Amino acid sequence: MFGRVFIVAVLYCITICKGEDPTNSSTPKLILLSFDGFRADYLTRFPMPNLQEFMKEGVEVEEVKNVFITKTFPNHYSLVTGLYAESHGIVANRMYDADTKQVFHMNDSHSKWWDEATPIWLTNQKQGHRSGCAMWPGSDVSIHNTTPSDFLYYNHTVSFAQRVNHITTWLTRPNDSINFAAIYWEEPDASGHRYGPDDYGNMSGVLKEVDKNVGYLMSELKKANLWDTVNVIITSDHGMAQCSNDRIIKLNDCIGPGNYTLVDDNPVASILPISDTKNVYDLLRNCHPHMKVYMKEEIPDRWHYKHNSRIQPLLLVADEGWMITQNESISMLGDHGYDNDLHSMHPFLAAHGPAFRKSYKMRTINNVDVYPMMCLILGITGQPNNGTLSNTKCLLANQWCIQVSEAIGIVIGAIMVLTTLTCIIIMLKKKMPSARPFSRLQFQDDDDPLIG
């Protein structure tokens, strides 16, 4: 009897040490939700009561540094693979593969474009679980000949509520429920392009609807008794910069259209030269003061954007707020794709659930860091990736962590304490009376004199 009790006690302790709830032995569940084009500072510029409530009970990352180029498809694939664009192969929303001579558009469902990486929904399934995706870019493609266990083909007319309802149904099925879900929603990106992020009047209405969607998700999870057991991550792919019809760079003003093919444009243009590459480069290099031109091999290393055959020989990058076209005007007032160091390009991240701390705020992480964190939450072994788990450990409830600022504070504090103690010791030594010279030769009362 004592032996059985001892074994049960040991197993209980092991469960506690692993950071699991001993009253809930079910597989950890996780929802990843992306609101396309949700710029980080929207959180401080617009009222969002539901999202604020969500973060108050969970964690917030004020800015997420995304991957270059700061476009929809590259960043959504980075979130679910933990890879830079050059590594996962979805380098733009429009691509040309020099090896196969084929062109990719956003509605292309051929798996060859996606097979350079393995998204988390497939890794989760390969390790004995089930995944469900509602419109997440690439989730309706048979990647490595496999689709999510449950998924919806992309259809922009399907409402946010319908997408959430599918997910909650998949999560609560009695026998074959999913444990990982990914949801994509097109706003506020579509309206950000139309109005620009600085149009407070129009964008406030758009973001009010986005916040209502957050409230709907919270409500449905509570109705399904999932709120306290499911982990939810809300984030985005990129931000948005204010643009203008007065800030347009027309390439045909600098070079004849017969000299090149424009693979992708606005505000980062991929150029496939038809004539001599060096000649095209020289013509474009001095085209406009608000546009930088790079040979492929000269693309800055910090962008991790040169080691893939789908990246073209020339890359044109506009300054923030400027747009690149061949010859036409552009009606939209907001855009993204710019340098990923720009704050206007950064999204945010918020998370809630048993895996996360309560009321905790962090300044920044990289979006490739989200993947290893999700793998840890799900209890699966991830694929090789560019993310760093230690960057997100402070967000997690069962992980010990110390931020750089805290570490610096501890070091400075220790130095101050040691310095103070050293000064005190030196001062005390100075105050102590020193022995008189030759005191050892002084006669005591009972000493005999040397001379009688």
Swiss-Prot record:
Q: Which parts of the sequence bind Zn(2+) 2?
A: D189, H193, H336
Q: Which sites does the entry annotate for glycosylation?
A: N24, N107, N155, N175, N202, N259, N327, N386
Reported function: Hydrolyzes extracellular Ap3A into AMP and ADP, and Ap4A into AMP and ATP. Ap3A and Ap4A are diadenosine polyphosphates thought to induce proliferation of vascular smooth muscle cells. Acts as a procoagulant, mediating platelet aggregation at the site of nascent thrombus via release of ADP from Ap3A and activation of ADP receptors.
Protein name stated in the entry: Bis(5'-adenosyl)-triphosphatase enpp4
Disulfide topology: C254-C287, C394-C401
Residues annotated as binding substrate are N93, Y154, D189
- Annotated membrane-spanning segments are 408-428
Q: Which positions are annotated as binding Zn(2+) 1?
A: D36, T72, D237, H238
- List the subcellular locations: Cell membrane
The cofactors named for this UniProt entry are: Zn(2+)
Question: A single GO CC term, please?
Answer: plasma membrane
The catalysed reaction is:
P(1),P(3)-bis(5'-adenosyl) triphosphate + H2O = AMP + ADP + 2 H(+)
The family this protein is said to belong to: Belongs to the nucleotide pyrophosphatase/phosphodiesterase family.
Keywords attached to this entry = Blood coagulation, Cell membrane, Disulfide bond, Glycoprotein, Hemostasis, Hydrolase, Membrane, Metal-binding, Signal, Transmembrane, Transmembrane helix, Zinc
One GO MF term: bis(5'-adenosyl)-triphosphatase activity
Catalytic residues at: T72 (amp-threonine intermediate)
Chief place where the protein resides: membrane
Which organism is this protein's natural source? Xenopus laevis (African clawed frog)
Annotated signal sequence is 1-19
How does the record say this protein sits in the membrane? Single-pass type I membrane protein
